[in-house]
Amino acid sequence: MIFERKKYLDELIAGRGNGLVKIITGIRRCGKSFLLFDIWHNWLLEHGVTDNHIIEIQLDDFRNRRLRKPDALLDYIDSKVVDDGNPYYIVLDEVQLVEEFVDVILSLTHMRNVDVYVSGSNSRFLSSDVVTEFRGRGDEIRIWPLTFDEYFNGIGGDIRKAWLDYYTFGGLPQVALLETEEKKTDYLRGLYETTYLRDVIERNHLRNPEGMKELVRVLASGIGSSTNPTRIAHTFQSSQGVTIKRDTIKQYIDYLKDSFLIEEALRYDVKGRKYIGTETKYYFADIGIRAAILNYRQQEETHIMENIIYNELRSRGYNVDVGLVELGGKDENGKFVRRQLEVDFVVNRPPYRVYIQSAFHMPTPEKEQQERRPLLSINDHFRKIVIVGDDIHRKEDELGVLTIGLLDFLTDKKLLEQG
């Protein structure tokens, strides 16, 4: 079973020889090492690069422990690079294990005819500001867990069964390779407890690990719901009698974002063209991890579908906000009132903008009108889409609103770029 990761291969090809360090980031176990040591390695060989011009070092291998010293690593690479006019490709995995690794990598950029690629899964490397540390010499390539299209193309078979597995266990490549539901469940639970959660707690020297664990559960329980640190603090107080300060919760959320475990979707006033800072929504980078955190309770189809759509949009390279549309009008008593309608996703990647509603079912004309109303209240020329969980034929009405089935959307990579 092979997962091609063509999008990321294309990004590596586009950045080849650009003079920047290619920094492969993303949640742990999402396939960064496989991308570099298998997919990228094979592509280089197929395109004329000889094996002795590919220098690969897995720094978590105990046999390479001496190379974790800066001088030893630089001396080793120097011994392998011969100025024969052909470029060398230096690939370093778990690079954060090297002492002063930022300065070491910057030293490599001063060498002639070298192209440098680094990845890592430790929290030191996973920090979201790692690219900044490279002082403008880094080119970040963000890796996501498998999209549904990547997952289905890898495993094949019946698309509905593939969807049920993906919906339940997410898109981490190793999970897809496990044969039974029990193995998948055990793997995800162990990965969360011993890797993701421990990494965040140890890196940030948290004195209240139980508070962090409970916060993650609260966020997992509320995916797709607007919230803020103040509201979460009230939830702790009312449901558990536990006091955690708003600023502490905000800091904990930042730690989770830095580890790529969650992402934040900001609220955007579509007509006012400004961000509204009162509340945000949070989504998990992998829906299988979210399920494991909640012990596979709360498998609500509407929220899981929304999280998967969010991840799909982000993996395609779009910025994603939650849209608000304010309308004014008279109520039944003739009094002028203002109402706010929500657009699930305002999707941006210049020159494209798309407004998207996620609706698991639209069984009645009233429900369909409810989902379309926020989109029709936006008076601009950008595309407007309703994604439904049912298998339907896509249709575009006279007002330009496209309705499309979920699996159709997830497997059509060019849809958002069409006029």
Task: Briefly describe each language-model feature range.
Residues 2, 34, 45, 49, ...:
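A cross-kingdom feature that marks ATP-driven nucleic-acid transaction machinery
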Residues 24:
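Hydrophobic anchor at the beta1->P-loop junction of P-loop NTPases
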Residues 45-61:
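Conserved catalytic segments around the Walker B and adjacent sensor/switch elements
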Residues 124-139, 154-156:
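Short regulatory helix/loop adjacent to the ATP-binding pocket of P-loop NTPases
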